[in-house]
């Protein structure tokens, strides 16, 4: 197994242009596919999850042209649904942002489609989405365990009507349903059961749908109306914002060891909820400066916080490791959906924080972290989870440094993360 040793870092300073957002990249690729016209996507993320989506679209007959560095894509829309005369089997790795939306989109047309992935994907639930699609007439068959991939779709289109979908596990299910609803045969009324988690991710979806010409009536996130007869139309160009979750590591670095760290590609005009991570750093005592498309973090002594972070679940992981450098006990609440991500992130985070000496209480949907007097060095297991590797890079700011196991797992969203991280040092 590959290991990366991060030696102690005294101070960080510099500027990082954040690569494109994973959430926006895969949503935009699918909407561009369903749209009339050709769409040019710029600042597209070049990572494993996006490659799985692109490979699947190509297999489904979508024509696109990628730039040499894979960050610009010119895609010819189908002007409607995806159909195939021959049976198709698509491998989607561990890419939830490809599996869930494609599962929904492939029910719209005609054909037989089988969706598979890595072993971890077979443990990531999709039942709430499939239950909703079945209410609209979809024929979806699980191939192993009910409620989980792999699965086969025998597509004949979706009817309109009323549909209920659970919102308390993952917002990706609602995102997938929203994106396909305009192409159903009739108007769709979506009723959300339970408290909707990660609402800012739904805002990303609605903003992109509007960019492609579709209107959704949002009744306070409890009900969504999508009138029949709408069509996605290419806006011509789509600029993919920098990934706000990826920005969190560099902003935390500035807060812990700044110096001054500036991230560009996200700012106060961002449609991503994870930019609110900077507000949490500010509550902890960091000096934060906002621009339209940049955020600056400057360091100071951090103090612990006790907050509901359901609205920023991915970026909240960075608070868990930043908490090691804060005075007091930090509590991150309402984060049950950490458990159904690339790994069970609550269990993984608790295990690895204890390795470096932290006192950790792991609840069903919260984590409580008290930093040790002296942070220990350790070998950090990353569980094939990109965010575990990037979060624990913060331990380079301890006096003893840290070793990251399987550092290349960052290829899921940020292949050159550690190179960029090193550029801030000195």
Curated annotation (Swiss-Prot):
SUPFAM superfamilies: EPT/RTPC-like
Organism superkingdom: Bacteria
Active-site residues (renumbered): 314 (proton acceptor)
GO terms of biological process kind: amino acid biosynthetic process; aromatic amino acid family biosynthetic process; chorismate biosynthetic process
GO molecular function ontology, one term from the record: 3-phosphoshikimate 1-carboxyvinyltransferase activity
GO cellular component: cytoplasm
Compartments, record wording: Cytoplasm
Binding-site positions, phosphoenolpyruvate: 22, 96, 124, 172, 345, 387, 412
Main location, first listed in the record: cytoplasm
Pathway the protein takes part in: Metabolic intermediate biosynthesis; chorismate biosynthesis; chorismate from D-erythrose 4-phosphate and phosphoenolpyruvate: step 6/7
PROSITE patterns documented for this protein: EPSP_SYNTHASE_1, EPSP_SYNTHASE_2
Binding locations of 3-phosphoshikimate: 22-23, 27, 170-172, 198, 314, 337, 341
Catalytic activity: 3-phosphoshikimate + phosphoenolpyruvate = 5-O-(1-carboxyvinyl)-3-phosphoshikimate + phosphate
Keywords: Amino-acid biosynthesis, Aromatic amino acid biosynthesis, Cytoplasm, Transferase
Complex and partners: Monomer.
Protein's job: Catalyzes the transfer of the enolpyruvyl moiety of phosphoenolpyruvate (PEP) to the 5-hydroxyl of shikimate-3-phosphate (S3P) to produce enolpyruvyl shikimate-3-phosphate and inorganic phosphate.
HAMAP family linked to this entry: EPSP_synth
Assigned protein family: Belongs to the EPSP synthase family.
NCBIfam families assigned: aroA
Name of the protein in its database record: 3-phosphoshikimate 1-carboxyvinyltransferase
Gene name of the record: aroA
């Amino acid at each position: 197994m590959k290991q990366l040793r991060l030696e102690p870092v005294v101070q960080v300073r510099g500027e990082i242009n954040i690569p494109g957002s994973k959430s926006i990249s895969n949503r935009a690729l699918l909407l561009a596919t369903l749209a009339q016209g050709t769409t040019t996507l710029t600042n597209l993320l070049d990572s494993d999850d996006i490659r799985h989506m692109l490979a699947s679209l190509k297999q489904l007959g979508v024509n696109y042209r990628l730039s040499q560095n894979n960050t610009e894509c010119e895609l010819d829309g189908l002007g409607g649904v995806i159909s195939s005369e021959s049976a198709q089997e698509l491998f989607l790795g561990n890419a939830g942002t490809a599996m869930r939306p494609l599962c929904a989109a492939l029910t719209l047309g005609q054909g037989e489609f089988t969706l598979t992935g890595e072993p971890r994907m077979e443990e990531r639930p999709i039942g709430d989405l499939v239950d909703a699609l079945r209410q609209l007439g979809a024929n979806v068959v699980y191939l192993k365990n009910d409620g989980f991939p792999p699965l086969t779709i025998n597509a004949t289109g979706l009817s309109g009507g009323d549909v209920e979908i659970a919102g308390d596990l993952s917002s990706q299910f609602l995102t997938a349903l929203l994106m396909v609803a305009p192409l159903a045969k009739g108007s769709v009324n979506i009723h959300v059961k339970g408290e909707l988690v990660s609402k800012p991710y739904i805002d990303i979806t609605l903003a992109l749908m509007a960019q492609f010409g579709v209107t959704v009536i949002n009744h306070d996130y409890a009900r969504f109306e999508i009138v029949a007869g709408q069509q996605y139309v290419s806006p011509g160009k789509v600029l993919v914002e920098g990934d706000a979750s990826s920005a969190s590591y560099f902003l935390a670095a500035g807060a812990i060891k700044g110096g001054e760290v500036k991230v560009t590609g996200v700012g106060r005009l961002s449609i991503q909820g994870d930019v609110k991570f900077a507000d949490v750093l500010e509550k902890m005592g960091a000096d934060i400066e906002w621009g339209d498309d940049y955020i600056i973090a400057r360091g100071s002594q951090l103090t612990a916080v006790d907050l509901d972070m359901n609205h920023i679940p991915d970026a909240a992981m960075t608070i868990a490791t930043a908490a090691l450098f804060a005075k007091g006990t930090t509590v991150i609440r309402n984060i049950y959906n950490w458990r159904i991500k690339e790994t069970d992130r609550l269990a993984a985070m608790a295990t690895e924080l204890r390795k470096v000496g932290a006192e950790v209480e792991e609840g069903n949907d919260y984590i409580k972290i008290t930093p040790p007097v002296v942070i220990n060095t350790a070998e950090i297991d990353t569980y094939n989870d990109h965010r575990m590797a990037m979060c624990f890079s913060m331990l380079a700011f301890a006096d003893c440094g840290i070793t990251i196991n399987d550092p290349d797992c960052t290829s899921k969203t940020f292949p050159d993360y550690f190179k960029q991280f090193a550029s801030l040092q000195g």
